[in-house]
């Protein structure tokens, strides 16, 4: 693991939400439907009570709950405490970073010859939702509503890039911008099954790299499953650590 990049990552995590006793950093979606713990520095003995408190708080809000664990988080038994609290571990992803100040020549060349994806308007989020549905995603309407709220209230923090083929939306991804930290993040990449393995995902990545540079970002981050990580490493992204979401099942509320 790269210590400078880990330090930068933790700084971004601490900025991404609201501090709460623990200490933890709590991130709440604009519509209040999702609560996520994105950073923690709790003592071993305090962990169980803090986890119970945060899960109960989320359920009291009627929100989904997630604790986002990273490979370098402490204490080492944090993952065990999350499981013992009844949270469910989802797929582990690799955290990768790209230095936008020193792009690989292959990426610069590809950006020159690749037509950029379309930066979506709020109205075009309907096309993003269409891609999501055709990709088998759930909660599409709620996601579209959250994205529309963010794009309306804080347009400098979020972009959605869409690739169209013959007028139909086939691939897309989000770009999250945190201008004070000069960091940006790729998220929400998805492609309609019939159009996969045709370079459309790469097009959305290149388009978002260009947009991140234009916005003044210096480092671009992404959490990637193995298939996406393979494409991203070929574009110069470097593995930094791993991350894994732990989500609360509604049964916890009654315990």
Where are these regions (language model features)?
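N-terminal charged segments
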Residues: 1-61, 74-77, 154
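Conserved beta-hairpin
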Residues: 18-21, 77-88, 157-172
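A conserved beta-turn-beta hairpin within the catalytic core of GNAT-like acetyltransferases
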Residues: 27-38, 90, 177-187, 196
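Acyl-donor-binding surface of acyltransferase catalytic domains
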Residues: 47-123, 222, 228, 244-248
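A conserved beta-strand-loop-helix scaffold within acyl/acetyltransferase catalytic domains
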Residues: 139-194
